[in-house]
Amino acid sequence: MDPEAKVSSSRRRDLPPIPQGQRRTPRALPSMPSQDTAEEMPAPKSRKKKAKRDAESVDEPDDGGMEMGGLASRRQSECPEPLTPEPLDNPPQRRKKKKKAQAIDAEGDQTDLVSNGDTLDQNTDEEVTRKPKKRKVKPKVTETQSNNELDVEDDDVITDPQSPIPQHSLFSAPQGPSQPVGKVFVEKSRRFQAADRVEQWKPSGPIEQSIMDIRSMWTTRDVSMRVHSGFRVIGLFSHGFLAGYAVWNIIVVYVLAGDQMSSLSNLLQQFHTLAYPAQSLLYLLLALSTVSAFDRVNLAKAPAAMRSLLRLSPVALASVFYFSALVLSLSQQMTSDRINLYKYSSYNTTLWPPGSESSILYPWITVNLVVSLLVGLAWILMSTSPDIDNTEAFLMSMEMEYPNSEEKGNVTA
């Protein structure tokens, strides 16, 4: 015979009859906690300890131990998979089974008078009543909420282009005007000593050395730029000096000639020693000023120079005035030679025949006056536009090709 049947038969035999007035109605199960509270409850203890405690109660010799053993064996028969781990897909269902087992253990001592049929009916009723509560409602709510959250609204659509976010470095040096320092401190023999910055920098590699070599090499453009800048300074000086000298020359001539050119002989006697040097200096200054003015116009590009002249550019007009004054000054070179040789007129009457002073000196004085006016106007025009220099701009626009290291080696060899 099966030992479970023996335990059940002995139990039915030993139980006294229960009067009708004391028979209890089936107790209602305590309300099951919600899923939220079930999640917060601590995990139930393993059933190995419960199985051990039930085995000890079965070994006791009294009837109460037999009753507990029967209940434990019946519970084991009702729950054939107590020790197998349930799948993790449905954790709330596993906790419900554990909670049901705990409720049955707590009521084991108080329901000794209840028959097996009543307990089975009660268990079936519990399962029937708990099945409707297993409906999953929250996933549907979350799906609807997620659908509502994913709905696109008009306020969420941004049509304006977003301005780029300026990215500033967190560790950046303050942007201020840097002030170069002429001295640097170099550590020598465990002490810092002041030294010049230029002397300390030396090329540390072949690349820097090649860069220094290229910088030290002068190209044709560099030479022309240096010459042009130097001659420009000389030209500016010659413009001003020529204007002052031309005015001084014409004033001296008119003072010595007297009122209405009445004392031309006095002019010849006083000015014959200065005629030749004065004419030579005037010619030199006119030549320098004319070349300087032509450099400003940039005659290398004839069409551009003609366009500037047609537009009446100040530099172009000044160059024309200087050139005209130079031509007029050269036309009176023979007269200046005659004035210089006036001291020898007693020996050679053909140079200065008697009564020929007025016919020779009138054109010379008039030409000198025109030269003075042209030089003065040209100087004024050059002063109004000192920054215009087309030749310098043309030289800066030239592209130079630096020689390779091999070509350089061949040239130096």
Curated annotation (Swiss-Prot):
Biased composition range(s): Polar residues: 112-122
Alphabetic keyword roster: Cell projection, Cilium, Cilium biogenesis/degradation, Membrane, Transmembrane, Transmembrane helix
Any one Pfam family match given in the protein's UniProt record, by short name: TMEM237
Subcellular location as annotated: Membrane; Cell projection, Cilium
Disruption phenotype: Fishes lacking both tmem237a and tmem237b display defects in midsomitic embryos, including shortening of the anterior-posterior axis and small anterior structures, kinking of the notochord, and broadening and thinning of the somite.
Gene Ontology cellular-component annotations: ciliary transition zone; membrane
Membrane topology per record: Multi-pass membrane protein
Transmembrane parts of this sequence: 233-253, 274-294, 312-332, 360-380
UniProt keyword Zinc present: no
Biological process, per Gene Ontology: cilium assembly; convergent extension involved in gastrulation; regulation of Wnt signaling pathway
Region (Disordered): 1-162
InterPro entries per record: TMEM237 (IPR029409)
The organism's place on the tree of life at top rank: Eukaryota
Primary location class: membrane
Family classification: Belongs to the TMEM237 family.
Function as written in the Swiss-Prot or TrEMBL entry: Component of the transition zone in primary cilia. Required for ciliogenesis.
Name this protein carries in UniProt: Transmembrane protein 237B
Species this chain originates from: Danio rerio (Zebrafish)
